[in-house]
A protein has these predicted regions:
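A near-ubiquitous, low-amplitude feature marking generic local secondary-structure context
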Residues: 5, 42, 75, 138-142
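A generic local structural motif
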Residues: 55-57, 92, 118-121
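Thiol-based oxidoreductase modules, predominantly thioredoxin-like and allied folds used
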Residues: 70-81, 86-117
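Thioredoxin-like thiol-disulfide oxidoreductase module
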Residues: 97-143, 147-164
Length: 164
């Protein structure tokens, strides 16, 4: 799963939903909506995806040099505590000690607009739980996990294979 392709697919699906909603609201065909509101739709989508496009570009650049461990978790300043995120934290810290500079650690909190990346990577149906941890290498989402702590050994299975 290439991160750029996931972003493109998500953006196109979102565009389809916007056109469909506008067609329903204006009692018009989707083709009519696409031609009448083309500029407004494009501006809306561009604004909606601006932040996440920058994050994807940054992760793509970083992951060309070395693997990236992306960690999307609850903001530690939030009043609500994510117990799963807290149980996962020592595993991520252990990876920092084990791998040091050989991998890049990239953290996003759920209070940031960058958190939209979660939905770009995890496009399947079902409940979306924090944390999300993903290994990204050369622009590809090699593996991602959601809603549970990930054992150090699970990460190592993928990271060691990449770093060989």
């Amino acid at each position: 799963m290439m991160l750029e392709e996931l972003l493109r697919a998500h953006r196109e699906e979102f565009r389809r939903k916007v056109v469909s909603a506008l067609a329903k609201k204006h009692r018009a065909s989707e083709e009519d909506v696409r031609s009448r509101f083309a500029d407004a739709i494009e501006r809306f989508i561009q604004e909606k995806y601006e932040v996440v496009e920058k994050v994807v570009a940054r992760l793509n650049a970083l992951s060309q040099e070395r693997p990236v461990l992306l960690n999307i978790r609850r903001d530690p300043c939030s009043e609500e505590v994510c117990m799963i995120c807290e149980r996962d934290r020592p595993n991520v810290e252990a990876l920092k000690r084990i791998y040091g500079e050989s991998i890049t650690f990239y953290e996003i909190f759920d209070s940031s607009p960058e958190v939209a990346l979660y939905h770009i990577i995890h496009q399947e149906e079902g409940e979306k739980l924090l944390p999300m941890n993903a290994i990204i290498h050369k622009g590809e989402v090699v593996k991602f996990w959601t809603g549970r702590p990930v054992a150090v050994e699970e990460y190592q299975k993928y990271l060691d294979n990449i770093l060989q």
